[in-house]
């Protein structure tokens, strides 16, 4: 996907819920972001709402419906998908105008940073989830492929939409359920316009290293010494106690 950059139109409308003013200073408590963009030549777009860095919902452009990040959200609120489709149509028209005015000048591409981690501490044979976190990139176009032992995996994979950052870059999460094993290795393969070659982030089970023999010997020796000291100290106290008792018996009652 090493292609030259193309213009991307991104509109970001930010609504901030703020605390009370203190000495004319305003502190943000929560932030809601409405993010939308239209992309050429892909002819794709996105419309979503974000609350404090977490997606609330996005609009599926193909199905023309609102998709809530959590089903429960849709029980307390509603959003008409047609409104988002109308916004994207405006974005497309504005993009065409800006492209002509800029003489087809491409935007500046920013390569992604990629991290692979697990959802929870790894235990062999216990189900877990691999997370591929793609961060700080622009434009919002990436192709992500999970590899298991070098072969593509598609079963059970899922992903988020493109999530906005306050610096107008993007982030995205991809997920792969898996069963940890010492025999399997995984890679998250990321392709982006700004990369000359696909970026691979590797993950495999890393068994805890056993203690060296010298360390084990030292630990055993320390344990033995502590045990002997405890026995000696205990014996001393017992002897002192017996001597005091005998001395008291010899003196007899006053």
Swiss-Prot record:
Gene Ontology terms, MF aspect: MHC class II protein complex binding; peptide antigen binding
Family to which the UniProt record says this protein belongs: Belongs to the MHC class II family.
Name by which UniProt lists this protein: Mamu class II histocompatibility antigen, DR alpha chain
Cellular component GO terms, alphabetical: late endosome membrane; lysosomal membrane; MHC class II protein complex
Domain annotation Ig-like C1-type: ranges: 112-204
Top-level taxonomic group: Eukaryota
Region annotation (Alpha-1) ranges: 26-109
Signal peptide from the UniProt entry: 1-25
Membrane topology value: Single-pass type I membrane protein
Covalent link location (Glycyl lysine isopeptide (Lys-Gly) (interchain with G-Cter in ubiquitin)): 244
PROSITE patterns given in the database record: IG_LIKE, IG_MHC
Topology Extracellular: residue spans: 26-216
Segments crossing the lipid bilayer: 217-239
UniProt subcellular location: Membrane
Residues with attached carbohydrate: 103
Broad class of the protein's primary localization: membrane
Segments for region (Connecting peptide): 204-216
Disulfide-bonded cysteines: 132-188
Chain positions covered by the region annotation Alpha-2: 110-203
One record GO biological process: adaptive immune response
Keywords: Adaptive immunity, Disulfide bond, Glycoprotein, Immunity, Isopeptide bond, Membrane, MHC II, Signal, Transmembrane, Transmembrane helix, Ubl conjugation
Organism annotation: Macaca mulatta (Rhesus macaque)
